[in-house]
Amino acid sequence: IAWLYLDYLLGPVKWSENKKWAALTHETDGFLYVKPLSFMNNSGQVVQKILNYYKLLPKNFGLLLKKESDLTNELIVIHDDLDIPFGKYKTASDSSSAGHRGVQSIINYLKTKNFYRFRLGIANDLLRNQIPPEKFVLQKFNKEEKEKLNEIFSQISIKI
């Protein structure tokens, strides 16, 4: 869902493949937009490499930190959330992954929960009860769902 949002936000732009980071990137107006090419469960590794490159992690990163790093002004993560009804969203920072493996990977690699997140609801009770979660999240959106997503994307863009 994050890829769809970035396509909505940026329109047709040229994405550069960075093999070192395992990501597609686009930089504009001082912002770096990233589409990880890794499995979702390994998103943290991609994010860590990028933040290290831009020196946004503490110098003693990797050691046990006395205080967690606060990345709320440096990192925004957009992800799907099966616990939120389709077409709704919530924001979060300094909170647990709530079982989302991609978010947990980021928390594990960065050793902090202090980053900003947009949790985009994809829950559909009719389908969800029939399809295992790991397959449900890979389903394509239909035309009506895509229209609803564009409404949500517009709301999120205002907040970002």
Please report, for each region that a protein language model flagged, where it lies by residue.
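Short glycine-enriched, charge-decorated loop/helix-capping segments at active-site entrances
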Residues: 90-96, 136-141
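Nucleotide and nucleotide-moiety/phosphate-recognizing core
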Residues: 1-93, 104-118, 125-132, 146-158
